[in-house]
């Protein structure tokens, strides 16, 4: 057999194989016969000479296939029983259950550690072999071509984002029709822009500036006006951005500004009824007074009319009493007590005005037509306590109670006096 294999001619002789090749061929035949013929042949013979020729051809094919087999490094090597490092193997279970995760560390033994180390070394060998196969051509970008400057995508994008600029040959009517077809919202937005801008400029802004400048308390009406001012200015700024995009002839159908304008438009429609009915008339009246130069203050809405009337009456009476006698301290005390009483009455009246009328005792108890009972019998605890007290009184009449000694005689504390007699005489 030639090393190149180009001048190889098949022959029917067994002399071409050496002992090592015959052993390999015999092993290969046994492996092929095992799955197909479980019964081993003891004395096999052939009746025809043609079978020998067929066997020779089969041997040649087996040797050629054996030489190409990935499990054999080469016929001239001594390590014929070692598998090739490039061989994938024939067992699928080899490629499963080889990785370890966190929960597998508890059952990690020395054998598995050795297998993991061998797997790591094999991976490093494969990585090194792949790195050796790479050349400088693998790191070049020869097969990646740059897109041309005037690509079709850019042309399509320019057609999408820009409107046709050839309007010189169109009439005024055709221009209006083109504008209505391409941007029907343009006229509505421009009208809203002018209307809201005038509202902010002529009414909302002057009033709010005066309020902030003179530290006027922000009552709910002014807070609502400030909210309307913020919403309208935001809407006008978005409309201005929309007009800027239209001036640059950029298509705004898919632009986020359209969605934002719709949201602000809905919010303005929600605020408009209350603003037109309540807030705007008050702002107009307030603006007239500001322009006239009238000085005004915002009253405390928490004050009640009844309380103001009572305090005014008391102040008038107090001024009269103070003017008559300023040095009388008793009158001052009486005035303070009267003021306190009047304030309490005003507080009660204020509570009565705010709260509902309370229910009566009969409504709360809801007894109906229950029979009258003594007060002592209403509470069982009080009832049994009274019975016990009466039983003690009856027992004292039948059985004498035991009287314990209060204090024993401990001798005279200051000595014995001859003229003092404290003994008890026995009467006969």
Curated annotation (Swiss-Prot):
Keywords: Chromatin regulator, Developmental protein, Nucleus, Phosphoprotein, RNA-binding. Residues 15-24, 46-62, 324-336, 344-353 have a biased composition (Acidic residues). GO terms for biological process: chromatin organization; maturation of SSU-rRNA from tricistronic rRNA transcript (SSU-rRNA, 5.8S rRNA, LSU-rRNA). The modification Phosphoserine is found at residues 152, 323-324, 337. Residues 1-93, 317-386 are annotated as: Disordered. It is found in: Nucleus. It comes from the Eukaryota. Residues 370-386 have a biased composition (Basic residues). GO terms for cellular component: nucleolus; small-subunit processome. InterPro entries: Sas10/Utp3/C1D, Sas10_C_dom. GO terms for molecular function: RNA binding. Its main location: nucleus. Belongs to the SAS10 family. Transcription utilizes two promoters. Promoter 1 gives rise to the short transcript encoding Sas10 only. Promoter 2 generates a discistronic transcript of Sas10 and Rnp4F. The longer transcript becomes an RNA duplex which is a target for RNA editing via Adar editase; Rnp4F (not Sas10) is edited. Essential for gene silencing: has a role in the structure of silenced chromatin. May be involved in gene regulation during development. Binds RNA. This is Something about silencing protein 10.
